[in-house]
Amino acid sequence: MAKLVECVPNFSEGCNKEVIEALGRAISQTPGCTLLDVDAGASTNRTVYTFVGTPEAVVEGALSAARMAWELIDMSRHKGEHPRMGALDVCPFVPVMNISMEECVICAHVFGQRLSEELGVPVYLYGEAARQESRRTLPAIRAGEYEALPKKLEKPEWVPDFGPPAFVPQWGATVTGARTFLIAYNINLLCTKELAHRIALNIREQGRGADQPGSLKKVQGIGWYLEEENIAQVSTNLLDFETTPLHAVYEEVCYNAEALKLPVVGSQLVGLVPKKAMLDAAEFYIKKEKLFILEEEHKIKLVVSRLGLDSLSPFNPRERIIEYLVQAGQEDKGLVTKPLGAFVRAVGGRSAAPGGGSVAATAASLGAALGCMVGLMSYGKRQFEQLDSIMRNVIPPLHQAMDELVAMVDADSRAFSSYMEAMKLPKSTPEERERRVVAMQQGLKTAVEVPCTLAVKVNNLWSSLKMLAHHGNLACKSDLQVGAKMLEAAVFGAYFNVMINLKDITDEKFKTETSQMVTRLLEEAKQGSALVLALLEKREA
């Protein structure tokens, strides 16, 4: 699969529609770049562009937009609520799919060097690309903003990483770097700018200084007034949403606002958000309110409602969640997108993949789906009211496994294909032969790891199936019996696929450990299936 990098350039223009559109065209017309989002703010006088592409393409896209900004933006006239120091204020590169942080650091270095050479402007590196610890954070570099640059550039400690230590009034300076996914998130309040900033100081990690740190790690914050909406905002950057998630920021602002007797009236996501950040927030509110929600779409709706993400403008998940946008922009050629008949014919075709591994994953997903169905058929009606708490615990792991196991249909096929591709590598020289052998061995190990993972996922479901066998709707008895045997058959399939690939692996320790593990997993599946079937046989209608 192609490497995918996200680039999020922030330009200091949020009012002039012609300039905003011209910068967007410069990006979207760059080969290999897909422009996902344009978020312009009049009060901040700033526009955030989000686009994705290969490492090479996103560097070219960012440079194209920078060249256009050089022609259209004059920083000497810029005014806005948001801190800034340049026409292209900041340009981070973010790993999205099949790419490392180190590769994004290279993107930042290449971009910074080329930008400084072409335009003759100072460029600083931050985040994971920083060459100095004092420049890791954006606020540290941007301190004093554009107005402080003339004197700042004269100081030895502020010599740019690229370009001349000279003030360019038209441009200012640019910061580029590599970082994890940053979420720009604002909470709306009916109050003054000063009160919003007071809350921002309470929650941001920096707080009011070293002796008064804030309550939330990896969070930057500032208070401002949004003139076009006539509200104040606590504007935050979540530098690591795994450390401090969306809902934690919202709840902390609400807590502080309540103490000050201030109303919170929803919130706003600027730009795009990872799906995981939304689902983590959903799980928080599901647990907090003891809700029962299975479908991803419904979980997203819950978060939009609880955080008030549609308070200022409609929130369309298909346009705001990066995974949905990336999927929409790519042609999906996976096996699971095929009609059932086409998938069966693909299995029956004259090629090694899809084969037994994909069929085993299909069986596993269908087994989990049948278990999920039986659970749902035993829930939500008055006659099953006494089973409510049991089914709320039993159904979610089956529903989750159903989705995860479907994805493994393609994962198995891809894993085997990587081995087949390695076999085609050139072998004319000793070096080429060595590379080919290493690639083939890695391909075989990957081909083994996928069915092992499948077997583990299946065996995690037996406790749920046992509960269904005890308590589930007896009208669905045969469905649960079929589901149990499908899951058992899937582990048999995983076992056979592992064993046939192990024989060609030269790592004896890996072979022994994997063989023992998959044999144990097969025995566990046999016992789990037998117990479920025995429990069902004892029950009478």
From Swiss-Prot:
<dbReference type="InterPro" id="IPR013802">
    <property type="entry name" value="Formiminotransferase_C"/>
</dbReference>
<keyword id="KW-0369">Histidine metabolism</keyword>
<dbReference type="GO" id="GO:0030409">
    <property type="term" value="F:glutamate formimidoyltransferase activity"/>
</dbReference>
<feature type="region of interest" description="Cyclodeaminase/cyclohydrolase">
    <location>
        <begin position="335"/>
        <end position="541"/>
    </location>
</feature>
<comment type="similarity">
    <text>In the N-terminal section; belongs to the formiminotransferase family.</text>
</comment>
<comment type="subunit">
    <text>Homooctamer, including four polyglutamate binding sites. The subunits are arranged as a tetramer of dimers, and form a planar ring-shaped structure.</text>
</comment>
<keyword id="KW-0290">Folate-binding</keyword>
<protein>
    <recommendedName>
        <fullName>Formimidoyltransferase-cyclodeaminase</fullName>
        <ecNumber>2.1.2.5</ecNumber>
        <ecNumber>4.3.1.4</ecNumber>
    </recommendedName>
</protein>
<feature type="region of interest" description="Linker">
    <location>
        <begin position="327"/>
        <end position="334"/>
    </location>
</feature>
<dbReference type="Pfam" id="PF02971">
    <property type="entry name" value="FTCD"/>
</dbReference>
<feature type="active site" description="For formimidoyltransferase activity">
    <location>
        <position position="82"/>
    </location>
</feature>
<dbReference type="GO" id="GO:0019556">
    <property type="term" value="P:L-histidine catabolic process to glutamate and formamide"/>
</dbReference>
<dbReference type="InterPro" id="IPR007044">
    <property type="entry name" value="Cyclodeamin/CycHdrlase"/>
</dbReference>
<feature type="active site" description="For cyclodeaminase activity">
    <location>
        <position position="412"/>
    </location>
</feature>
<dbReference type="GO" id="GO:0005814">
    <property type="term" value="C:centriole"/>
</dbReference>
<comment type="similarity">
    <text>In the C-terminal section; belongs to the cyclodeaminase/cyclohydrolase family.</text>
</comment>
<dbReference type="GO" id="GO:0005542">
    <property type="term" value="F:folic acid binding"/>
</dbReference>
<keyword id="KW-0456">Lyase</keyword>
<comment type="function">
    <text>Folate-dependent enzyme, that displays both transferase and deaminase activity. Serves to channel one-carbon units from formiminoglutamate to the folate pool.</text>
</comment>
<dbReference type="GO" id="GO:0005794">
    <property type="term" value="C:Golgi apparatus"/>
</dbReference>
<comment type="function">
    <text>Binds and promotes bundling of vimentin filaments originating from the Golgi.</text>
</comment>
<keyword id="KW-0511">Multifunctional enzyme</keyword>
<comment type="pathway">
    <text>Amino-acid degradation; L-histidine degradation into L-glutamate; L-glutamate from N-formimidoyl-L-glutamate (transferase route): step 1/1.</text>
</comment>
<keyword id="KW-0808">Transferase</keyword>
<keyword id="KW-0963">Cytoplasm</keyword>
<dbReference type="InterPro" id="IPR022384">
    <property type="entry name" value="FormiminoTrfase_cat_dom_sf"/>
</dbReference>
<dbReference type="Pfam" id="PF07837">
    <property type="entry name" value="FTCD_N"/>
</dbReference>
<dbReference type="InterPro" id="IPR037064">
    <property type="entry name" value="Formiminotransferase_N_sf"/>
</dbReference>
<feature type="binding site">
    <location>
        <begin position="163"/>
        <end position="172"/>
    </location>
    <ligand>
        <name>folate</name>
    </ligand>
</feature>
<dbReference type="InterPro" id="IPR012886">
    <property type="entry name" value="Formiminotransferase_N"/>
</dbReference>
<keyword id="KW-0206">Cytoskeleton</keyword>
<dbReference type="InterPro" id="IPR036178">
    <property type="entry name" value="Formintransfe-cycloase-like_sf"/>
</dbReference>
<dbReference type="InterPro" id="IPR004227">
    <property type="entry name" value="Formiminotransferase_cat"/>
</dbReference>
<dbReference type="GO" id="GO:0005829">
    <property type="term" value="C:cytosol"/>
</dbReference>
<keyword id="KW-0333">Golgi apparatus</keyword>
<dbReference type="GO" id="GO:0030412">
    <property type="term" value="F:formimidoyltetrahydrofolate cyclodeaminase activity"/>
</dbReference>
<dbReference type="InterPro" id="IPR037070">
    <property type="entry name" value="Formiminotransferase_C_sf"/>
</dbReference>
<dbReference type="InterPro" id="IPR051623">
    <property type="entry name" value="FTCD"/>
</dbReference>
<feature type="region of interest" description="Formiminotransferase N-subdomain">
    <location>
        <begin position="1"/>
        <end position="181"/>
    </location>
</feature>
<feature type="region of interest" description="Formiminotransferase C-subdomain">
    <location>
        <begin position="182"/>
        <end position="326"/>
    </location>
</feature>
<dbReference type="Pfam" id="PF04961">
    <property type="entry name" value="FTCD_C"/>
</dbReference>
<dbReference type="GO" id="GO:0019557">
    <property type="term" value="P:L-histidine catabolic process to glutamate and formate"/>
</dbReference>
